[in-house]
Curated annotation (Swiss-Prot):
This is Hepatocyte nuclear factor 1-beta. One of its GO terms (molecular function) is DNA-binding transcription factor activity, RNA polymerase II-specific. The gene is Hnf1b. Its main location: nucleus. Residues 93-188 form the POU-specific atypical domain. One of its GO terms (cellular component) is nucleus. It comes from the Eukaryota. PROSITE patterns: HNF_P1, HOMEOBOX_1, HOMEOBOX_2, POU_4. Transcription factor that binds to the inverted palindrome 5'-GTTAATNATTAAC-3'. Binds to the FPC element in the cAMP regulatory unit of the PLAU gene. Transcriptional activity is increased by coactivator PCBD1.
Amino acid sequence: MVSKLTSLQQELLSALLSSGVTKEVLIQALEELLPSPNFGVKLETLPLSPGSGADLDTKPVFHTLTNGHAKGRLSGDEGSEDGDDYDTPPILKELQALNTEEAAEQRAEVDRMLSEDPWRAAKMIKGYMQQHNIPQREVVDVTGLNQSHLSQHLNKGTPMKTQKRAALYTWYVRKQREILRQFNQTVQSSGNMTDKSSQDQLLFLFPEFSQQNQGPGQSEDTCSEPTNKKMRRNRFKWGPASQQILYQAYDRQKNPSKEEREALVEECNRAECLQRGVSPSKAHGLGSNLVTEVRVYNWFANRRKEEAFRQKLAMDAYSSNQTHNLNPLLTHGSPHHQPSSSPPNKMSGVRYNQPGNNEVTSSSTISHHGNSAMVTSQSVLQQVSPASLDPGHSLLSPDSKMQITVSGGGLPPVSTLTNIHSLSHHNPQQSQNLIMTPLSGVMAIAQSLNTSQAQGVPVINSVASSLAALQPVQFSQQLHSPHQQPLMQQSPGSHMAQQPFMAAVTQLQNSHMYAHKQEPPQYSHTSRFPSAMVVTDTSSINTLTSMSSSKQCPLQAW
């Protein structure tokens, strides 16, 4: 006997014997601790001192609880497998108290399951619960088992004590018979249940009738009802068969009509009955798992809300990513709009002196796109004396100050012209340098020049954001260059003096008045484009005098 005990058990026995407990007293205590035939458990504290040995002859006390919980008992996953420290649950007490034939059959079934493999029985119970959508909470409420221990026993085969397994098997046998009775109910009984439920609803709406019709016997029954209504009502749970049907219907129609929902109700109830192995005509036996039209409506509404929420999350994530990607571009600038890297000698300063000593300071950025260098002008007019120069004609000129000086004669506001220079790293044959100037200055040039030819020049209607459309403007004057040499001689090193257009506009030294054209060109949407700019190519400005009056430059779009 001693050889089968562990070292800890041997130490415990030695401690008991050394405390004064005799062999006979120890054997008697062990016999009293054995389980009784009615599944009762005798709990008695063994004496730890010799003086308490006289009290061992007292009768043992059965500690039973109605709810299956006790302060001194171990938790569901503690103790050995065959420990007897688990109190008798109410379900076992009820089964033992019944003397009917049905109770005897249930006890025989429980004994048979206890004698079989626990893991095999656990898998059978788990499959039955999944088939009928039974939550583990219901088993815990009835048997008093620990839910964590129950889940581990059903899913992993964790060892469970005999008393606990007996309670679990008792619940399983009873649940089988209960569900079988539900599905075997006749249609008449189902109608009676419907009438009873409608009567209960009327009594709920008008409680005064229930108080008047309630007799003394009914009040006693009401007092005894709370003990039977401690268990919570099972929450409705969608089965896998119904979910598959609903998801397929959701793919076809996200918001079905009432007729479609009713058809889905019949289809889901039929699938639930087939899942449980019963005829679809017995759908009323589903009980709390019965699918209704309201539940189908709520299911579709919840799916639509979930889909809308997922779409919102996706759009928020996309917008945040776009903002994150744009931050470096806003701080460092676009790679297609980097400032020009031309040498400083290309930005030589030139100054025009008019009688009023007017100075126009501007700054511009050269943007590179492909092989052509486009000059985007955004100037800030600081001091402008000619009254005909509209302050709205603001252009940005190069970063380096451009000052042009010419002695004698008044000039049109060509000082607002941008500093055009050829880039050293671009092919000059492929570069196309454009000059932008206010339309008022161009009209003054057109009035002061003397020619018989007409030439079309594309005009850009400038707005604050430089977004415009080009239109042709007719010139009826001729360019002649009697004063080109003085300008080129005064500033031989100037880059602006080498441009034909800049040399051509300096011939108006004797003109001090800005003549206005009698028939100005018509522009579309003049209210939206109050000012206009002339854009032309510096390499082709010398061809203005040679082109015929019937030719016009094609319209360009920004």
